[in-house]
Structures are given as structure tokens and as C-alpha cells.
Amino acid sequence: MFTIQSQANIAENIVLSFEQVVAVRTFEHNGYVVVAVLTGPIFSQAERQELLQSIKDMVADTLEISQSHILASYDMELFRAMDNISDNEKDKLLEKAMQMQSI
């Protein structure tokens, strides 16, 4: 018997395959997959950006969706808020994640 996994669950499993990643939380909403990542120490901003880009590349390729629909962040507030969220809260978090991508 096959189980159908949500895109968020698949993304979570992909992100956990990166050795730098300690924890991850995901959700999907309005066609977007939001990924909040906790890592061990990464001191270089370039390395941090490279890891997020690698995560977006791998998730987009696996899920066969546009990278513009993958929102990845190191934001701790976003990570905490994703613990147990309602649909109304997802709208707010999705908006915050989208704003962070444009920075």
C-alpha cells in the first residue's frame, strides 16, 4: 500500500538530508512550500545563502515545482510559529516568508 505524502512532508525529508540541518519545519499553503531551517553554526553569509539555495533547488526539482514557490528561511520566529498553526496563521506566516525572500 502506498501512502501519499504532502509536498511539505517530502520537502521536510529532503531538507533533513543536508548534514548541516539540525531541524526543519514545513507547511504548504496557497501553492507555496515554506521551509524554516535550524542548522549548526554557519558563520559565512555566503555559505548560509548557498545552503538555502541548495535546499530550494533540491526541493523544487523533487516536487517538480518552480523555485519561486519554495520559501526557505533561517528565521527562528518563523520556525517557532510553525509548530502548530491554523490556516489563518498560515496566511500571516506565508506573507512574512515572502517578505523575507525579497530582502
Regions found by a protein language model. Name each.
Residues 16-38:
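Short edge beta-strands and adjacent turn/loop segments
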Residues 32-42, 78-84:
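Short glycine/threonine-rich beta-strand-turn micro-motifs
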Residues 22-26, 66-74:
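Short beta-strand elements
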Residues 8-18, 44-67:
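Short, non-transmembrane amphipathic alpha-helical segments
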Residues 1, 40-46:
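Second-shell loop/turn segments in exported
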Residues 1-13, 97:
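N-terminal, intrinsically disordered, polar/charged segments of Gram-positive cell-envelope systems
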Residues 73-103:
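Polar/charged, Gly/Pro-rich intrinsically disordered segments
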